[in-house]
A protein has these predicted regions:
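N-terminal low-complexity or amphipathic/hydrophobic leaders
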Residues: 28, 35-47
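A short beta-turn/loop motif at secondary-structure boundaries
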Residues: 32-35, 110-112
Length: 204
């Protein structure tokens, strides 16, 4: 697990919500130029972090949306999770071996408040059965991991993927080289529990 993506309709209100629930105020990260979003971050310790993301009103003409589900988001929820890998090409090969289409690797970057640049590449899985599966990120050499300079105080107590077909999901994750807790459910949903200054808090 590299990071969790918490989608919100409005970034400022999302930051306030997280501070109210956890006692930690996420720091504004920046814009994703051309992808229509902006974010704020908080560290979860151990090279893990929580990304709060929303549509950027200053990028209404963006050519593509970082997370299309944000268009129809009416309330805050976990919308994605990312796994860090050292070789996206190998990850793509693993996905193809399981008949899963991939998008990428795609280069990404974001200017930070201090002027430094975060750079990465992502690989996304595409297809009718990919809901609940992670996307993959490869941080470029020389890029400081966001967990190192984001507000701290929270840690990830647990994470699970709720799924309608747990055997398929477990088999697929294993084939992708990913270890995650999968539990049965009538719907596909992500659920995380954070240990915070205000106690354990659940997000879904």
């Amino acid at each position: 697990m590299d990071h969790l993506v918490f989608g919100v309709p409005d970034l400022a209100r999302g930051i306030e919500l997280l501070e109210h629930r956890t006692g930690v105020r996420a720091r504004f990260g920046g814009q994703h130029p051309g992808r229509g979003t902006h974010n704020a971050l908080m560290s979860l310790g151990g090279r893990q972090y929580l990304e709060i993301i929303a549509i950027d009103p200053m990028q209404v003409e963006a050519s593509s949306l970082h997370f299309p589900e944000l268009k129809h988001l009416s309330e805050p929820r976990l919308i994605a999770w990312a796994v860090a890998v050292e070789d996206l090409v190998e990850t793509a090969r693993r996905a193809t071996a399981q008949n899963i289409d991939t998008i990428g690797p795609l280069a990404g970057s974001r200017a930070q408040a201090d002027g430094s640049l975060l750079s990465w590449q992502t690989l996304r899985l595409s297809g009718p059965r990919t809901e609940g599966l992670p996307f993959f990120i490869e941080w470029q050499k020389g890029t400081a991991h966001p967990s190192q300079h984001s507000p701290s105080g929270c840690t990830l107590a647990s994470f699970e993927v709720e799924h309608t077909d747990i055997e398929w999901m477990r088999h697929t994750l294993k084939g992708l080289g990913v270890d995650a807790n999968v539990v049965p459910s009538a719907t596909v949903r992500l659920k995380a529990r954070l240990q915070t200054p205000k106690g354990e808090v659940e997000f879904g």
